[in-house]
Amino acid sequence: MRAPAPKEPVTEDLDPAADPYAAYAALRAKGPVHRVRAPGTGDSWLVVTHEAVRAALTDPRLRNDIRHSANWETDGGHAIGRNMLQSDPPQHTRLRRLVAGHFAPGRIAGLRPRMEAVARELLAQLPERGTTDLVSGYALPLPVTVICEVLGVPVADRAAFHTWSNELVMPTSEEAAAGSAGALTGYLTELIAEKTRSPDDSLLATLATTTGDASAGPLPGPGAGGLMPEELLGMAFLLLVAGHETTVNLISATLHSLLAHPDQLARLRADPSLTGGAVEESLRYNSPVHAGAFRFAAEPLDLAGTRIGAGDAVLVSLAAASRDPLAFPDPDRFDITRRPRGHLGFGHGPHHCLGAPLARAEATIALRLLLDRYPFLAFATDPADLTWRTSTLLRGLRELPLRLGRPGGRDSRGPPA
C-alpha cells in the first residue's frame, strides 16, 4: 500500500532491512514522532516512543479504514475483501465479535493437545543430530497446520496458500504481490463456496453459514449477526494470514534470542516454568510485528506535540515502543525473568491482536517441546550471516540453521558427535 504524502519534506529514511533497533533508538532520541519514507510506501508519520504509541493506538481520530487516506482511491494496495484490520467501529466491533469467542483463552486451551501432537509429529521428522533449518522444518509448519485445521483448509492446499500469503505480507515485487492477491482471492472464494454447500465443523464453515444477504444493502449494523460476502472473504484472508505469519516469526525469533544469549538458554533449561516468560520477553525484545497497520488521520490532530494533517498516514512502531528505556529499564538486554508488562508485541487498544492467546500457546508449546527433545542446540552458521524477511510492518528470519544434539530428556548432555 502506498501511503499519502505529507505536505512538508520528508526528514528521515526508514530502511526495514537495516538494523531497525539502532534506527529506532536514534529516532527516539530526537522525539516521539517523525516523518519517514520506507521502501515501497509513500511518506508517513512514524511514532516511536511507548507513551506516544499507546496514545496513537487508542486515538479515535486515527482510523484504520483506507478511505480516510488522502489518496485512498489509488492506495488500496492488495487488500482482499473487507477485514477487521482495515475497519473502524462500529463495523470493526461487529466483525470482531463474530470471531472473538473462537480465539478466547478457554477455546485455545482446548486446542493445546492438538498443537502438542502437531509439534511432536514435526519434531519426529527432524534429524536426531546434524543440521536443520528450524523455520521450514518446525516454526513454519506448526502454526500453518493449526490455523488451517481451525479454518478448514485442506492439507493439499496449504503449501500454495502459504506461498501466496508470504508474497502478500512481504512482497518481492508489485507484480508478484498482485498475482498472489488474485490467486488467493480465487482460492478463498472457491473454498467459501464449498463450505457453504457442504458445511463441516470448521470455523470458516461456521462463518459461511452466517453470511448476510448482499442484496440487503449496506453493511448490517452491530448485532445484525451476518457477514456480507466481501466481509467473509476478508475475514478468511485475515485469519489465515495473520493466524500464522507472525507466529512463525515469534517462534524462530525466540529461539534466535535464546541461542544468542546462552545464559538465558541455560536458565530456561534449568527451569522450564520460565518458557512463558521467554516468549513474552521475545515479544518485547524482538517483536515479530514491527509496526501496526497504517492509520489515517480523519481530521487534523496533535500527536505527542506534532501536528498531523487530515488524510496523513501514521505508522505506529510496536517494536520501537517495546525498546523504549522510559518504559523498560535496560531495554536492549534480553532477560527471560523480566516481567515486561505493557509490551506492545500484540498491539494495544481496539485492534489488540485477536489471536494473541493462540500465538502464545503455539510459541510456548513449540519452544518447550523443542528444548525437551534436543539437549543441545546451536547456530549452524554465523548469526551475523542470517537473513531477515523484512517489510514495513513485519520482520522475521528467512531461515534458522541449527546444529542439533541427540534427542532425549532433559538429563541428556553434550553436543552432537
Predicted regions and their residues:
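Cytochrome P450
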Residues: M1-A417
